[in-house]
């Protein structure tokens, strides 16, 4: 059942660990894209229209058709344990942004990670000229720059959220620290 553009303002790209709770919290209806097209917790909620689209392999036309009703994007993609990070975060984001080139988007929100910042013992802000230390951070930083420059060139408002402590299902931070009780300081 198609949903009109007026009734579907937000598309959540990536409805896994972060995107799924967000999609459920947004006012109905919500357009949701996932690599698998499945909803792990039983049936897809009635307010959510779920589409299976893998950003790494989807063609521009398919992405544009699915996203055409959206007026805002929230990008919550994550590389799986066996996926190539560059393919997901750079190639997939490029494909997504290309597909949205002619859409009248009012805002793009990108969920990133604090790994996009360098490892410093001190205060950091967005003006820090130093690159991130590891490959993961460098790819995240590159993806942020891609989003920023593309949105600015199109005049689309954008927000990058750098989240910390993202470990995904079954890898909660507490469980990681449990092995070393001294790692958690009051």
Q: Residues of each region from the PLM?
A:
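Conserved N-terminal Rossmann-fold NAD(P)-binding element of oxidoreductases
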Residues: 10-14
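N-terminal Rossmann-fold NAD(P) dinucleotide-binding loop
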Residues: 19-20
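Conserved Rossmann-fold cofactor-binding substructure of NAD(P)-dependent oxidoreductases
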Residues: 45-71
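NAD(P)-cofactor binding segment of oxidoreductase domains
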Residues: 70-109, 145-146
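Short-chain dehydrogenase/reductase
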Residues: 86-90, 125-145
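Conserved Rossmann-fold NAD(P)-dependent oxidoreductase catalytic core, especially the SDR/UDP-sugar
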Residues: 95-134
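Conserved beta-loop-beta element that borders a ligand/cofactor-binding pocket
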Residues: 145-169
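A conserved pocket-lining segment of Rossmann-fold NAD(P)-dependent short-chain dehydrogenase/reductase
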Residues: 173-186
């Amino acid at each position: 059942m198609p949903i009109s553009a007026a009734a579907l303002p937000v598309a959540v790209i990536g409805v896994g660990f972060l995107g799924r709770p967000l999609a459920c919290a947004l006012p109905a209806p919500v357009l949701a894209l996932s690599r698998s097209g499945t909803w792990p917790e039983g049936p897809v909620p009635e307010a959510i229209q779920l589409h299976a689209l893998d950003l790494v392999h989807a063609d521009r036309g398919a992405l544009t058709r699915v996203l055409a009703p959206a007026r805002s994007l929230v990008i919550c993609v994550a590389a799986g344990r066996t996926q190539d990070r560059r393919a997901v975060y750079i190639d997939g984001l490029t494909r997504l942004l290309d597909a949205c080139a002619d859409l009248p988007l009012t805002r793009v929100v990108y969920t990133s990670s604090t790994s996009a910042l360098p490892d410093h013992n001190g205060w950091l802000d967005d003006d820090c000229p130093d690159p991130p230390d590891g490959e993961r951070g460098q790819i995240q930083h590159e993806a942020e720059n891609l989003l920023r420059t593309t949105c600015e060139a199109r005049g689309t408002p954008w927000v990058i959220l750098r989240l910390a402590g993202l470990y995904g299902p079954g890898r909660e931070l507490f469980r990681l620290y449990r092995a070393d009780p001294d790692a958690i300081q009051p």
